[in-house]
Amino acid sequence: MAALSKSIPHNCYEIGHTWQPSCWLSFLHITRGALEESLKIYAPLYLIAAILRKRKLDYYLHKLLPEILQSASFLTANGALFMAFFCILRKILGKFYLWSPGFGAALPASYVAILVERKSRRGLLTIYMANLATETLFRMGVARGVITTLRNGEVLLFCITAAMYMFFFRCKDGLKGFTFSALRFIVGKEEIPTHSYSPEAAYAKVEQKTEKHEEKPRGMNIIALVRKLVDSVCKHGPRHRCCKHYEDNCISYCIKGFIRMFSVGYLIQCCLRIPSAFRHLFTQPSRLLSLFYNKENFQLGAFLGSFVSIYKGTSCFLRWVRNLDDELHAIIAGFLAGVSMMFYKSTTISMYLASKLVETMYFKGIEAGKVPYFPHADTIIYSISTAICFQAAVMEVQTLRPSYWKFLLRLTKGRFAVMNRKVLDVFGTGASKNFPDFTPRLDPRYTTVTPELPIEFS
């Protein structure tokens, strides 16, 4: 607490906009760079989203450009206003405190910026930043020795999150919208208790398929014979009466689930690597082949495939053991399926899903009347979360997620890295740890402290 009251007498030029003594010109530099990068980010993003959603011509003519400009304005405002409040706070306080160059400047900037963005996007942005802020606070705690890291902690968190998600998925009206659709795509509609696919309908379809096969000429090719053999093996085998996978036995049901989601995971990772591979198509053609046999492709495939197969296998096993189908099975099956993250460890995925789970449970509590509703909660949470991340970006970059730090550098055209962090080292956060050899060249006419003098608290 004592560190919060300590201060240094340097001005905003000496600490923040070291490339330009003028606060106004520095603000314009940040604004121009942020606007340029924001348009580069949101223009293709909204265009691709519109194509995938099969928007009509009216959307492209009247709504696409305003939405791009609104989101770009939000991101630009977040970066530019941080620079503005950075200078304003220094002029008001007359000094820099531990909290003022990061948290203090980012809090009002983020609050004003999020009000510019469309309401439909605020919730998603809040979840992302809350997740990032939580991860940053955790790393700060670890760096200070307050928190002890848990081996495979991200896997354990994912197991707990998966258990709760799958339980809500199995419950009637437990999940809605995109989350429900995504889980139905991953684990299949057979695991939904309200699944309306009756055994009679299933067997009727099987008979129809058989009749169609019989109508075909006898000269069947090898592929058709193999397919017929596989179908025969899948249909004849152990399947509990409570299992709703009517066209498969329990074993083939799990195997098919693994193969399907392994393929999906493999293809997703391949697609993510396509842009970087094509950039080196002419200079390093061999890198194009690595697109298909990269280790991460198989890791993501193994993660998704094993998650589905473990979940389905455990669910079938519990139905056999207990001789009934129960929503509580999903808790055990989901927890065990979460172990699959050992193939593809990701703190980002675990934290994001956990944040979404908290949001889901919060809104369920509101619907049940057990939790109070807080107006503008998303705006406040976003502002505080972003301020925490900016505090880390200024005072202790080593605790910030590397991908977000790269994003901040891109948004500010690299100017976030030219802050005079050696001066900030006196606060004891290791501000210059990642910048040991950088010292800005300052014009002595605009400085308040001679750079050669030792820095002391005032």
Curated annotation (Swiss-Prot):
Gene Ontology MF annotations: lipid transporter activity
Signal peptide start and end residues: none
Membrane-protein topology: Multi-pass membrane protein
Chain segments annotated as transmembrane: 68-88, 96-116, 149-169, 298-318, 331-351, 380-400
Organism domain of life: Eukaryota
Keywords of the record: Membrane, Mitochondrion, Peroxisome, Transmembrane, Transmembrane helix
Localisation per UniProt entry: Mitochondrion membrane; Peroxisome membrane
Coiled-coil stretches noted in the UniProt entry, renumbered to this chain: none
One term under GO cellular component: mitochondrion
Record has Nucleus as a keyword: no
GO biological process: alpha-linolenic acid metabolic process; fatty acid derivative biosynthetic process; fatty acid derivative transport; long-chain fatty acid biosynthetic process; long-chain fatty acid transport; mitochondrion organization; regulation of mitochondrial fission; regulation of oxidative phosphorylation
Keyword Mitochondrion listed: yes
UniProt record similarity statement: Belongs to the TMEM135 family.
Function: Involved in mitochondrial metabolism by regulating the balance between mitochondrial fusion and fission. May act as a regulator of mitochondrial fission that promotes DNM1L-dependent fission through activation of DNM1L. May be involved in peroxisome organization.
Protein's UniProt name: Transmembrane protein 135
Organism name: Bos taurus (Bovine)
